[in-house]
Amino acid sequence: MDQKRLTHLRQLETESIHIIREVAAEFANPVMLYSIGKDSSVMLHLARKAFYPGTLPFPLLHVDTGWKFREMYAFRDRTANAYGCELLVHKNPEGVAMGINPFVHGSAKHTDIMKTEGLKQALNKYGFDAAFGGARRDEEKSRAKERIYSFRDRFHRWDPKNQRPELWRNYNGQINKGESIRVFPLSNWTEQDIWQYIWLENIDIVPLYLAAERPVLERDGMLMMVDDDRIDLQPGEVIKKRMVRFRTLGCWPLTGAVESHAQTLPEIIEEMLVSTTSERQGRMIDRDQAGSMELKKRQGYF
């Protein structure tokens, strides 16, 4: 890795650690949202650096839908145990009682009830006033205009027209009773930065990011990996083994794989350098207006 790239990554690292420390010092009850993906892995790594040799002064929170890949659940538990992190897992009990699932109820309703409402329930239950998230500005247009300190009202709603200026790395964390913030320490990172940093720091990631032969079928213009027996095959659908990997991870029925032979980090980085498609092209929840990212964030999404 050339010196210019290395210096750039260290600048990003320094900024992120500064943000994490600022929030830990400024807020009474912060939490780190842990979605198990590559960005969460980098954010957790930075947080551990920020407070080394001590332990994290806040817990991890996973809002579970019940539909993550099995490898993600195994990785989550292994990581929390290895690092001695306090891990809170919340699943919307009302959604569970209603039997909400992406196949029957669709991506928009599933995401709203199991993720957005589940997140708000967890934040209210534990009284968190600041929640770290791994979103980056290069991922999606609504995230591109969101501040590092993203203020939410007492209903956890985001108003993009009412954001505070962030000048010279000075962040205004003053909130009223009942309000909270979402904090995005990776805002200025790109997908390429994330992969370069994972390689540089030897950060452990879910194996689904690396290409392997996996059982997939084609549905709604995406390659769906069949992760368990809850799927109902539609007429004409055939499950085949193909060399695929994932650029982004979520609920397995809503996350499309990409055909790839990149089985190492350098191969992923090389693949990203020539990619002309969006990182979130395989996320079903981003495809319709009802499920648009900005609308979901206005309603309290991550």
From Swiss-Prot:
Pfam families (UniProt xref): PAPS_reduct
Magnesium is among the record's keywords: no
Pathway: Sulfur metabolism; hydrogen sulfide biosynthesis; sulfite from sulfate: step 1/3
Catalytic activity: sulfate + ATP + H(+) = adenosine 5'-phosphosulfate + diphosphate
Alphabetical keyword list: ATP-binding, Nucleotide-binding, Nucleotidyltransferase, Transferase
Origin superkingdom: Bacteria
GO molecular function: ATP binding; sulfate adenylyltransferase (ATP) activity
BP GO annotations: hydrogen sulfide biosynthetic process; sulfate assimilation
EC number: 2.7.7.4
Family per similarity comment: Belongs to the PAPS reductase family. CysD subfamily.
Subunit structure: Heterodimer composed of CysD, the smaller subunit, and CysN.
Its job: With CysN forms the ATP sulfurylase (ATPS) that catalyzes the adenylation of sulfate producing adenosine 5'-phosphosulfate (APS) and diphosphate, the first enzymatic step in sulfur assimilation pathway. APS synthesis involves the formation of a high-energy phosphoric-sulfuric acid anhydride bond driven by GTP hydrolysis by CysN coupled to ATP hydrolysis by CysD.
Protein name per UniProt: Sulfate adenylyltransferase subunit 2
Organism this protein belongs to: Salmonella paratyphi A (strain AKU_12601)
Gene: cysD
